């Protein structure tokens, strides 16, 4: 009899929870319509994979790409709508969040054609790969719109779990297994540190979890200047530092970049930075509003360390992927300048603009590394010597992306850095901007060193990898080269006409 009553109570409780979830989805589902498109794409992929006897690979690519493009269209369709808070305060929709969601969707859309030939050559499981990419994209989008500490913790875990699985996708590779283990351990530790910081905010604010309500709670409890806030700030900064690969929390980054499949590295190198930057901006700007001087100082120190260590260690690398890993550590240091400046001197606008350029520059570089690796089986920097003599298109496009990463005019990277540094200078961050300028010069050195190798024509320097290099006979049918062309155009032309891009970015301030 007791068991029967307990069973009925369980059924009633489950029904109430289901009805509440259905009610929220029915009335608030329109606010996450782009995310719902991705969820539908995920379900469709699973259905086709489980019911089809003969795996039709083009359909999987088509469904994934179409879902991403439709999600982008849904975001653009509701552009400039009034900010809305939905799902009982857990999710916020505004232009600031949506532009970061757009950047994440753009990254994923470019990464899928970049991965096609690699997956076919390495015989990776296509369905699982696309499922992980779409799920990670979904987690990143929810993180951009998260409005409370619980969602901010859960959404990146959705992204991180897929990232761990993607980094260890080539199970037979010892380096991939090692990279996955390091990534998993460091990611778990950083999440624990982050949630510990949120627990301090929860207690100090009187039990609030929404970002704005945390501020109100701190005012009501008079704890906004207490030592506990400093403790929470330190823990949350360390947790975000791991997610952004800021020095000295960057130790996992080079090993994960080197050991993971190259298309996975291309995907993680941009999407994780975009999602974490959006989250960091909201966390520091809202709950820590009364501690702005403290978190400005912390981020300045981390940015300086990242720019110096990232660019100096990149000089000594012999692997292209490890070099780009340390380069990305330096690049995120530049992005931090925009977060510190804030919206007073167009700091957020310059940060968003530079991240848009960084996506094209970084993905363009990785597209060339994928293509070169498939045709030669190596990613050693010295093995690129003389590539121009065999494939001028690949060598020139790689050189353009590297020069744009270094910030040479008139490429997009130069104008992005110029505006970012100018905003920092106007905000009084003279020392930080000076370090940024000096380290940019250092980065140009190791990028030019690679370009010199690409253009060399001396036979004694050309390795057997380039001597035996074979180009694809059907250039128009190569999806990687399609991504390359898009990224080269985006790395060069937009820099000349930056004003429209900056104007759009300035409209995203929350």
From Swiss-Prot:
Please give the catalytic activity noted in the UniProt record. a plastoquinone + NADH + (n+1) H(+)(in) = a plastoquinol + NAD(+) + n H(+)(out); a plastoquinone + NADPH + (n+1) H(+)(in) = a plastoquinol + NADP(+) + n H(+)(out)
> Where is this protein localized, as stated in its record?
Plastid, Chloroplast thylakoid membrane
Q: Which family does it belong to?
A: Belongs to the complex I subunit 2 family.
Q: Which domain of life is it from?
A: Eukaryota
Q: TM spans, by residue?
A: 24-44, 59-79, 99-119, 124-144, 150-170, 184-204, 229-249, 295-315, 323-343, 354-374, 395-415, 418-438, 484-504
Q: Which UniProt keywords apply?
A: Chloroplast, Membrane, NAD, NADP, Plastid, Plastoquinone, Quinone, Thylakoid, Translocase, Transmembrane, Transmembrane helix, Transport
GO MF term set: NADH dehydrogenase (ubiquinone) activity; quinone binding
Q: What enzyme category does the UniProt record give?
A: translocase
- Fetch the PANTHER family from UniProt: NADH DEHYDROGENASE
Q: Which GO terms describe its biological process?
A: ATP synthesis coupled electron transport; photosynthesis, light reaction
Originating organism: Acorus calamus var. americanus (American sweet flag)
Protein name, per record: NAD(P)H-quinone oxidoreductase subunit 2 A, chloroplastic
Pfam families linked? Ndh2_N, Proton_antipo_M
């Amino acid at each position: 009899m007791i068991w029967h009553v307990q069973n009925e109570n369980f059924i009633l409780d489950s029904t109430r929870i289901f009805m509440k979830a259905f009610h929220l989805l029915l009335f608030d589902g329109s606010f996450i319509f782009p995310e719902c498109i991705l969820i539908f794409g995920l379900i469709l992929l699973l259905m086709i994979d489980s019911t089809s006897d003969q795996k039709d690979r083009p359909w999987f690519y088509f469904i994934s790409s179409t879902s991403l493009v439709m999600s982008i269209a849904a975001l653009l369709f509701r552009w400039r709508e009034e900010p809305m808070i939905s799902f009982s305060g857990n999710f916020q929709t505004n232009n600031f969040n949506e532009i970061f969601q757009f950047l994440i969707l753009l990254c994923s859309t470019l990464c899928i054609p970049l991965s096609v030939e690699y997956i076919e050559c390495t015989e990776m499981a296509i369905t699982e790969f696309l499922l992980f990419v779409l799920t990670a994209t979904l987690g990143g989008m929810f993180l951009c719109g998260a409005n409370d500490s619980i969602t901010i913790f859960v959404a990146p875990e959705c992204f991180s779990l897929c990232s761990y699985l993607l980094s260890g996708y080539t199970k037979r590779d010892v380096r991939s297994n090692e990279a996955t283990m390091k990534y998993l351990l460091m990611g778990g530790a950083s999440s624990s540190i982050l949630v510990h910081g949120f627990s301090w905010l929860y207690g100090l604010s009187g039990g609030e979890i929404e970002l704005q309500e945390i501020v109100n709670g701190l005012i009501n409890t008079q704890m906004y200047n207490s030592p506990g806030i400093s403790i929470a700030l330190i823990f949350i900064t360390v947790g975000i530092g791991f997610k952004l690969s800021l020095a000295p929390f960057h130790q996992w980054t080079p090993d994960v970049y080197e050991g993971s499949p190259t298309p996975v590295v291309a995907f993680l190198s941009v999407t994780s930075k975009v999602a974490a930057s959006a989250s960091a901006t909201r966390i520091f700007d809202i709950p820590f509003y009364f501690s702005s001087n403290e978190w400005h100082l912390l981020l300045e120190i981390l940015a300086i360390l990242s720019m110096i260590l990232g660019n100096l260690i990149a000089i000594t690398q012999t692997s292209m992927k490890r070099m780009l890993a340390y380069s990305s550590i330096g690049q995120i240091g530049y992005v931090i300048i925009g977060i510190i400046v804030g919206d007073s001197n167009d700091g957020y606008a310059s940060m968003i603009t530079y991240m848009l350029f960084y996506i094209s520059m970084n993905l363009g570089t990785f597209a060339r590394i994928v293509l070169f690796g498939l045709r030669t089986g190596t990613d050693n920097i010295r093995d690129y010597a003389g590539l121009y003599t065999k494939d001028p298109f690949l060598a020139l496009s790689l050189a353009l992306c590297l020069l744009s990463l270094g910030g040479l005019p008139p490429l997009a990277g130069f104008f992005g850095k110029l505006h970012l540094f100018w905003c920092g200078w106007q905000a009084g961050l003279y020392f930080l901007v000076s370090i940024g300028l000096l380290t940019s010069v250092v980065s140009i050195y190791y990028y030019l060193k690679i370009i010199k190798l690409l253009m060399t024509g001396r036979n004694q320097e050309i390795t057997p990898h380039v001597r035996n290099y074979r180009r694809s006979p059907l250039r128009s049918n190569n999806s990687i080269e399609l991504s390359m062309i898009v990224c080269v155009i985006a790395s060069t032309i937009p820099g000349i006409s930056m004003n429209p891009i900056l104007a759009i970015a300035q409209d995203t301030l929350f």
